[in-house]
């Protein structure tokens, strides 16, 4: 299989991740913080080390605490539902946001009745900073959510500039780093984010089952989930300090062990440099494919290793299904859980895109095979492919 769906999850993982998880699962996968015996203490120490590595990664020492969660969607729900909302609240979201942000906000908006607005885009689909500043002045924000990197076009959004404006109005700022933490060099203090989320299985090259967020020191959240924590068990109340206040239930120590190993591997991998090289290689050669419409960042300086496209004569679902069935190439088709941005793309009426997302282990030869497959799909009549059976996948 030629795997080009790294925005969904990076695959494969570094070999050290598989080795660490296998060994830990066989010999040390006990419940951390739930016992005084050696193995439980060692599991707890491994979790502490993982938090420390995450703090170092985002240069967040003495700036933030790391709260762990089983997925970044859970983490974002903890943040959004952990805030206090009123009818007077004003939330701004970029059009690039994922449903992990949009759906919790919509749920609360319907219940409470506050305002949700989209950040404006310029003609090239970059965030219009001047218009953003004007909108903030006209209707001051109480909450601003921005994706660090679009999971549709690979656009690296100007989060620091947006949050600098938002902080003039003391807004809570949320940076969705699912496609960025581990890839971009982030300095937590410079971001001006109150919360920065991460997904272990994406740009951190760890496994599923471990994610979380950095929460700025001094920022508090209401409790969404309650239960056992392994501490203060004599009380019916959750612990009052972070991260314990926001973490309940047994942790997936095997997944955390995998992330621990990935964090040791990342500094030497230079994944951003690798993605930029691969993206440049792809972009230089895409014009050789007739009938291709491309959706990407406004320019290469703000482009990560994710690009979207559509192929004339085929729905995104049809093209992706043919790439899979005939060429064993894995890409994503659809709206990528980010429908708002599709309203701004030239794929009206919002039919979705073919997404190609590269990772550290992608080879240039695999990109060549993708390009040749796209050319072949355009050349052939495909009479032997049951397109009717493929419709509706998008």
What are these regions (language model features)?
Residues 1-394:
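Pyridoxal 5′-phosphate
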């Amino acid at each position: 299989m030629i795997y080009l769906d790294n925005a969904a999850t990076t695959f494969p993982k570094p070999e050290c991740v598989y080795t660490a998880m296998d060994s830990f699962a066989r010999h040390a996968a006990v419940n951390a913080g739930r016992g005084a015996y050696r193995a439980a203490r060692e599991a707890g120490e491994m979790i502490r080390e993982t938090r420390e590595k995450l703090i170092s990664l985002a240069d967040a020492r003495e700036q933030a605490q790391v709260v762990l969660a089983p997925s970044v969607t859970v983490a974002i729900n903890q943040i959004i539902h952990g805030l206090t909302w009123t009818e007077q609240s004003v939330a701004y979201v970029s059009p690039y946001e994922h449903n992990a942000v949009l759906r919790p906000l919509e749920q609360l908006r319907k219940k409470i009745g506050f305002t949700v607005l989209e950040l404006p885009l310029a003609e090239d689909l970059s965030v219009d900073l001047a218009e953003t500043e004007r909108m903030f002045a006209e209707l001051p924000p109480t909450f601003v959510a921005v994706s660090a990197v679009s999971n549709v076009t690979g656009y690296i959004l100007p989060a620091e500039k947006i949050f600098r404006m938002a902080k003039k109005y003391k807004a809570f700022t949320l940076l969705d780093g699912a496609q960025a933490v581990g890839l971009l060099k982030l300095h937590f203090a410079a971001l001006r984010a109150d919360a920065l989320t991460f997904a272990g299985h994406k740009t951190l090259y760890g496994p599923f089952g471990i994610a979380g967020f950095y929460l700025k020191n001094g920022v508090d959240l209401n409790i969404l989930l309650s239960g056992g924590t392994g501490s203060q068990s004599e009380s019916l109340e959750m612990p009052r300090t972070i991260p314990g206040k926001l973490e309940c239930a047994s942790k997936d120590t095997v997944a955390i062990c995998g992330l621990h190993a990935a964090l040791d591997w990342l500094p030497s991998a230079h994944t951003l440099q690798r993605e930029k090289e691969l993206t440049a290689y792809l972009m230089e050669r895409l014009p050789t494919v007739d009938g291709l419409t491309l959706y990407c960042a406004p320019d290469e300086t703000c482009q990560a290793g994710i690009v979207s496209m559509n192929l004339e004569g085929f729905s995104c679902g049809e093209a992706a299904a043919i790439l899979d069935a005939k060429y064993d190439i894995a890409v994503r088709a659809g709206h990528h859980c980010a429908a708002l941005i599709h309203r701004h793309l030239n794929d009206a009426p919002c039919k979705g895109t073919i997404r190609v997302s590269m990772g550290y282990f992608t080879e240039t030869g695999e990109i060549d095979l993708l390009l040749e497959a796209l050319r072949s799909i355009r050349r052939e009549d495909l009479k032997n492919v049951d397109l009717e059976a493929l419709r509706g996948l998008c």
